[in-house]
Amino acid sequence: MKNQIYMEFYKKLKEIVEPICEKYSYELVDLEYRREPHGWVLRVYIDKVGGVTVEDCAYLSEKISKELDIKDPIPHSYILEVSSPGLDRPLKRKRDFERHMGEKVNITLLEEIEGKKKFEGKIFKVDESSVTLKIDDSFVTIPLEKIKKAMLIVEF
C-alpha cells in the first residue's frame, strides 16, 4: 500500500516536471523525493545533448519551481534541487542503454539469469524489451524488466 501511494505521488510529480523539461529541450532522467537530515528534498536529474551546465540547472529550477508552486503537489516545505545525473548515472530506460551503446556497465538483476544476478560487460545491442551485453567472447541478453540496477562503469 505504501509503495502504491509513493508510485502515484511519483507519477504526479513526473506529470508536472517532465513537460517543463521537454519544453526547454531537456530530458528528465530521474526524480527523487526523500527525507534527509535537513528536511525533504525533491531532486530532479536532467540531461541534454552536449551535457548540462550549472546555468541550465538554475534556469530549469526556476521554471519547475514556479509550476510546483502553482500545482502544489507537495503538502509541506521541501528543497528543490536540479542537477545533472553525473558520470555514474543509473541506466533505467531503453534510450539510456541506447545512448551508451558500446560502453561498459554493471547490471544487477531482480532474479537470476544463467545462474547469476550480476553482470559486467559492454552494451552490444538494445531492442524494445532487452539489452545484450558482450562479456569477453560471449553474449548475454537481459530483459529490461528484470534489471534492478544498471550503472555505467567510468574508466579513466
Swiss-Prot record:
Gene Ontology annotations of biological process type: ribosomal small subunit assembly; translation
CDD domains cross-referenced by the UniProt entry: YlxS_C
Keyword vocabulary terms for this entry: Cytoplasm, Ribosome biogenesis
Highest rank taxon of the organism: Bacteria
PANTHER family hit by this protein: RIBOSOME MATURATION FACTOR RIMP
Annotated gene: rimP
Stated role: Required for maturation of 30S ribosomal subunits.
Protein family: Belongs to the RimP family.
Compartment(s) where it occurs, according to its Swiss-Prot or TrEMBL record: Cytoplasm
Organism of this sequence: Dictyoglomus thermophilum (strain ATCC 35947 / DSM 3960 / H-6-12)
Xref: Pfam families: DUF150_C, RimP_N
Record InterPro entries: Ribosome_maturation_RimP (IPR003728), RimP_C (IPR028998), RimP_C_sf (IPR036847), RimP_N (IPR028989), RimP_N_sf (IPR035956)
Name used for this protein in its record: Ribosome maturation factor RimP
HAMAP family, A to Z: RimP
CC terms in the record's Gene Ontology section: cytosol
